[in-house]
Amino acid sequence: MSQDLWSFCLSRLEHELPPQQFNTWIKTLQADEEKAGASVALRLVAPSRFVLQWVRERYLRRIGELGAEFHGAPIEIELVLPAAGAARPAARPVIGSGPVAGPAPAPTPSQAPAATAAAPAVVTRPAEPESSIVTASDLAYEKTRLNADFTFDTLVTGRANDLARAAAMQVAQNPGTSYNPLFVYGGVGLGKTHLVHAIGNAVYRHNPRAVIRYVHVEDYYADVVRAYQQKSFDAFKRYYRSLDLLLIDDIQFFNNKNRTQEEFFHAFNALTEARKQIVITCDTYPKDIQGLEDRLISRFDWGLTVQIEPPELEMRVAILQKKAEALRVDLHDDVAFLIAKNLRSNVRELEGALNKVVAFARFHGRGITLEVAKDALKDLLNAHNRQLTIEHIQKTVADYYKIKVADMHSKKRTRVIARPRQVAMWLAKDLTPMSLPAIGEAFGGRDHTTVMHACRTIAELRLGDHQLNHDVHVLTQVLRG
């Protein structure tokens, strides 16, 4: 009976979920008919605690609904880990069409704790606390320092990050052979850290025996200092050179730390020579990092460098909807568009604004309406709109390029004047809600087609002109505060 029920659930979920989610989370579950109790209609065995927690939080409720549909009444579902000595289900492909090579997970030496679902809308906890059992697999995952919530499934994608995501998925599928190192750069709060954790989690799911470490540069620096103080550099070197995957965040903080750069240089060489994967994040293009040795910068160019840009409107709306889903709140499109239209800088700012709206609504006992959102974000929206005026953009760009603000309105076409003016037009279009005709009017009464041409020119030049791209990036960060 359990197999028939689970086959029904699998069939329905395969049509409801994206293939990536279905193959990663649902297809790895196995129905255990022998050990299902009289009160339990379906007992599912998850291959690891990581998968168990993820399924319980995101899919168990839906499985319960399908079970009730199959039986014609609410049922109880039990979600457990393999019993001691039991063989785990084989690992399945996670991303793309091809699996990542790696040994199957080792059996988990633990008594399986259960998570149960009674009626479709209710999830109950096991009598025994799940935290009372710690397996070797749990300890191995904890040592990676990965965030289990940061996966490719939970990453909202759009034009701003589609190239970076595609490259990251290639690296996760073929660590050490595709794009080594992978260098991801972009402004604060755009999802770089999420992306590197997603790589680590994908590799770990395929190969739990892989030695993975996520480390922020400041923690790496602290490890170097500790090794120096304790005279334990041999152990330090052995550890970092034993990794299969090194994910290092915010490399720009290596600036002027000579001993740390020296150690990382040798670790980098050892890992790449052994075909081990390195993924690096930074807030700027490699050649623009201040205080970093040229030999390191040149090695960053060995692999692939990709940029994550600020999310476009549609992507910002999708990010808000995803966050609302995680918070289990109903977010209407008009509220999402209000937030997304006015807050453009990064994902953290968007999520912070949504959290503020939700808290405001709950405190006042009101639903999340457009009026409530405007009240909750009144100060933030007013400050944002005051700061990002076309006049403010013109002054900031003029100061940056050391030209006069009057040049923004003039008819001069020399390169030293025309290019900054085009940059200012591009920023005005990207950072303000002003229409193209209104922007043109603010730049000396120019036609909207001139603004369109300027924006198109800057967008195209940014693809190949690293200095211009850096200028635009810096100006954007300055203007957004």
UniProtKB/Swiss-Prot annotation:
One of its GO terms (cellular component) is cytoplasm. InterPro entries: AAA+_ATPase, Chromosome_initiator_DnaA, Chromosome_initiator_DnaA-like, Chromosome_initiator_DnaA_CS, DnaA_C, DnaA_dom, DnaA_N_dom, DnaA_N_sf. One of its GO terms (biological process) is DNA replication initiation. The keyword ATP-binding applies. GO terms for molecular function: ATP binding; ATP hydrolysis activity; DNA replication origin binding; lipid binding. Residues 74-144 are annotated as: Domain II. Pfam families: Bac_DnaA (PF00308), Bac_DnaA_C (PF08299), DnaA_N (PF11638). Transmembrane segments: none annotated. Residues 111-123 have a biased composition (Low complexity). Residues 101-123 are annotated as: Disordered. ATP binds at residues 189, 191-193. Oligomerizes as a right-handed, spiral filament on DNA at oriC. Plays an essential role in the initiation and regulation of chromosomal replication. ATP-DnaA binds to the origin of replication (oriC) to initiate formation of the DNA replication initiation complex once per cell cycle. Binds the DnaA box (a 9 base pair repeat at the origin) and separates the double-stranded (ds)DNA. Forms a right-handed helical filament on oriC DNA; dsDNA binds to the exterior of the filament while single-stranded (ss)DNA is stabiized in the filament's interior. This is Chromosomal replication initiator protein DnaA. It comes from Aromatoleum aromaticum (strain DSM 19018 / LMG 30748 / EbN1) (Azoarcus sp. (strain EbN1)). The lineage of its organism: Bacteria, Pseudomonadati, Pseudomonadota, Betaproteobacteria, Rhodocyclales.
